[in-house]
Structure formats: structure tokens, C-alpha cells
Amino acid sequence: MLTSFQQAVHKAYVKTVEKVTPTLSTSKFLEEGVLTPEEFVQAGDLLTDKCQTWTWESGDPSRNVSYLPKEKQFLLTRNVPCYNRVRTLENESKASKADEIQIEDDGEDSWVAPQPVGNQDDIEDEKVDISSLKIDDKKPNTTTTTTAKPTNNNNNNNDDEDEDEDGDIPDLDDFQDDNIIEEEDPAVLSKNNKTTTTTTANNNNNNNSENKVEDNDNILRTRTYDISITYDKYYQTPRVWLFGYDENRKPLKPEEIFEDISEDHAHKTVTIDSHPHLGISFAYIHPCRHAAVMKKLVDRQSENGKEPRVDQYLFLFLKFISVVIPTIEYDFTLEFDT
């Protein structure tokens, strides 16, 4: 991982090179897995057509780049749900995503595909042979007794037997909430009692509201993200940017965003920087390995007898980006084989 000083030096170097390097004009999609600006627009048009949660944006006019149309400076999808933190996936296999990418280890810049969590030996130990299970012919004892309905006599014991007869049917009284204040019909309460009860109930509701989030850990805290895709002139690939909100629509802090990044990529391939078209801080996935990964996927398509299409580039791209942000559920649903 680069230090802050190294990152600053690298950014300055990239900006300098971008200014003097001509924009890619010849397609190298099949040879190198990169895009020209025109191919980026073509791929973005298909993405916005097939997945209408994505839109083209113009951004700040003062930050527009000349090699892209003014109304198509970058792609954006808003309010993308993120229901879980990455740490909650500890027992869920992500092999279906990890298998999509096999990149050779080229040192610090190599792309890391997360491995399924858990010990395979433990999984094997939990398997049970159904043939070894024994079935007991004995009927289990039950606490419910069935009795004949009482005749015309009014013996008090029969009342108890009636209760046993309906033992399996829950009584409404069983659902009595211990926190309910009103034990009597409010319509018959005196004026003083009604005032006291109302005040107490209001205080109780206020306390419940204050403690609701703290006391109930089962509440689903849904974060949302705005995700944008820009064209990176230096790397000649798309670059993904993330801006997150908590359940109260407050912007997430950088350390909170990293909770939604794959452990193998947080602080390594994901860093914080100013968005090139908006001028505010976003987290972004570093594009240094994007071309190599895309070249792998394009080659795999060719090996499987499929003709790679440059306009489908972003669907392949977003598919492998999901390895980095596995719990952020953005749309990239287009059926094709890789």
C-alpha cells in the first residue's frame, strides 16, 4: 500500500502525463482491454439503455473534458442499497464472483480475488449420512388431552377440561403486552385517569423512540450509495467512484465506506480523492489493474466461442467490480457468458 506522500507524488505524475499524452483514438479493446473515449460512450449508451437506473451526467461545466460529449461526461446511479457490511459475509461463499477473475501475481499492483470464508474440513464434518438416522416408532408424549364435550351437568371440573381441549389454540390473552398502560376501556375512564394515562403513554413512547435504535440490534440499517463511472484518460479504462450515506442520509465517513469494501481491497485498491467532474471527495477503485482484468475476460469470451463486443464492456467491467464491493447491489443485469 502506498503512503500518503507516495500517493500525492503519483497523482501529480499522472496529471502531468495526462496533459501531454494524446487521447487514445485507435481501438485496443481486444488487444489490451482498454477503451477509447468513443468506445466508453458507446458502452455507456448500452448500459443506460438496458439498466435505466444508470444515467449520463454532465457534472460541473468548468470540469468538462473535451474528449467526451458535454452531456455525457460520466455515468451515475443513485441510492443503490447496501444492506450488509462486508464482515457479515464471513460464512458466505463468494466463489461465484471470485472465479470470474484469475490474475497472475504481479506484485503490489496485482488484483486480489477474495477466497471463500471457512474451513472446508469443518464443512465436511457437518455432513450427515441419512441412512444412519434411526426412526423411533414410539409416538411422542404430548401434554394436550382430548376429552369429550360436557353434557348438561354444570360441574366446575368440566370447565378445566374445556380449557385443556383447546390447548393448541392460542388465547388472545397470551399476547398481552406487559408495556400496555391501559388495563380498562378508555371510554369509561374518568377525566383525571385519562389525563394520567395519556401522559404516561406519551412518556413511554418517547423513551421507546430514543432507545429504539440502541436496544434493537435486529433493525436493518440500510446504507445507500451513489456510484459513478468516469473515463480515465491515463489508464484508458473506466474508473468507479463511491459516495455513501447512512440510514439517516448522512454522508459516510471514509472509514465507514471501507466497511463495505472487500477486506482484500480496502486501503489497497480503494482510496479517497476528489471527483473529477463534481469536485467533492469520493472513494474510488484504483484502475491500475482494470485493463489486465478486462483483457482476461475478453480472452475467456473468445475461448468460449463468443465474440467480444465493446459495447458490452461496462457489463463485464461492473461484474468484476462486484468482487470489490460485494454488498452494494447496483444494476448490471445483462445475460451473456464469459
Swiss-Prot record:
Residues 91-100 have a biased composition (Basic and acidic residues). Keywords: Autophagy, Cytoplasm, Protein transport, Transport, Ubl conjugation, Ubl conjugation pathway. Residues 91-215 are annotated as: Disordered. Interacts with atg7 and atg12. The complex composed of atg3 and atg7 plays a role in the conjugation of atg12 to atg5. Residues 158-186 have a biased composition (Acidic residues). One of its GO terms (biological process) is nucleophagy. GO terms for cellular component: cytosol; phagophore assembly site. The active site is at C288. Its main location: cytoplasm. It holds the Pfam family Autophagy_act_C. Conjugated to atg12. atg12-conjugation plays a role in regulation of mitochondrial homeostasis and cell death, while it is not involved in PE-conjugation to atg8 and autophagy. Belongs to the ATG3 family. Gene3D superfamilies: 3.30.1460.50. Residues 141-157, 192-210 have a biased composition (Low complexity). This is Autophagy-related protein 3. E2 conjugating enzyme required for the cytoplasm to vacuole transport (Cvt), and autophagy. Responsible for the E2-like covalent binding of phosphatidylethanolamine to the C-terminal Gly of atg8. The atg12-atg5 conjugate plays a role of an E3 and promotes the transfer of atg8 from atg3 to phosphatidylethanolamine (PE). This step is required for the membrane association of atg8. The formation of the atg8-phosphatidylethanolamine conjugates is essential for autophagy and for the cytoplasm to vacuole transport (Cvt). It is found in: Cytoplasm. GO terms for molecular function: Atg8-family conjugating enzyme activity.
